[in-house]
Every structure is written in C-alpha cells, then in structure tokens.
Amino acid sequence: MNNLSFLASLLAYTITNPKIGRQILQAKYQSWQDSGYPVFNYAEKKLQLDDIIKALFPESSYLIEDLRKGTDKLQNHVDDFFNKLKNETYPSKKKPYPLEYTLDNKSGLFLYILCKIIKPEKVVETGVAYGLSSMYILQALSENKKGMLYSIDSVFSPWQSKEMIGSAIPSHLCENWRLVFGSSSEKLKET
C-alpha cells in the first residue's frame, strides 16, 4: 500500500469513525515525532537464558529444560496459526499486524518462566496484536492455577479489528484473560 492510498483510506476511515480516526492520526504523529530522536547504540552482552534466570532468581530450583517443555505445545500452536496467515497479505482484515510484531520463542519462554517463578496475581500488558506474549503468560498462569492477565489494546488502523486482537490465543487459555479495549493512556488508570 503506497503512501497516497494509505492516506486516502485513512481520511475516509476518519470521516466515518472520527474518534478512532483521531487516535490513529495521533499515533502516526507520535511515531513521526519519535523518528526525529536519536537512536542510541548500547553495548550488547549476550547471555544465555539459564544464566539470566539464575541471576534473577538464585533460589529457584526450576530447570530451564523442564520449563521449555511447558511451551512446546504453544510453539506448535503458533506455527499452525502463522501457517494459516502465510498466504494473506498485510495489511488486511485477515492479517492486520506485520509479522515483525511477533514474539520470538526465547522471549516467549522468558515471559513464561517469569510468570511460573513469580506466580503473579495480576499482569498488565499494553499492546496485544495477535497475542503471542499473552499466550506464554497465560500458559504459566493456567499452570499456576492463579493469576489474571489484563491486556490493553485498541484498533489503530482501518484494517484492524477488535476480533483479531489476541486471535492467536488458544481458547483454553482465555479463562485467565481480560481484554481491555481502548488506548493504554486512558485504560491503564482503570486497570
């Protein structure tokens, strides 16, 4: 989608949906402003997940390999979900988020492990997209038999829909999940 057709579709959408259209314009303006700030290069030190968990939780008796097994089914589910989307084009109603929005396996495993060890009663996440990070958190909460994930997200583009937010989350994990629909700046105060 070139810039001109994007702007035309955004203008048409804004006319019929002024509140959401205003939010989209504000988000695009904020993104444009952010692009003017310098990007800092930080030194990178690669650590293994085992080392990170041991540093954060030295008393923990969890073995990473055992915890990794708890996410194998999730990874298969993610693979199946994205296989169904591979022939869809972005942006569209069926593929509203770019694949760059996806979470890699190690980051998902890290979220899962954090929730398994900490056993939180409440988790708040801003931004859901397909729901990959939500899935890993929810898997841990389900296994912990406690905790609730509150995910805040909204529709920011004409091709996005409320139905696609968290669409990758398996239905059996939704018991511990509440989608709070709206902008984070407004809804964080309520959550």
What role is predicted for each listed range?
Residues 1-61:
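Membrane-proximal basic amphipathic "stem/tether" segments
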Residues 34, 46, 75, 79, ...:
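Proteins with a high burden of low-complexity, intrinsically disordered sequence enriched in S/T/G/P/A and R
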Residues 56-60, 64, 184-191:
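Short, intrinsically disordered, charge-balanced linker/junction segments flanking boundaries
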Residues 41, 52, 60-105, 113-118:
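Class I SAM-dependent transferase core
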Residues 3-10, 97-191:
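S-adenosylmethionine/decaboxylated-SAM
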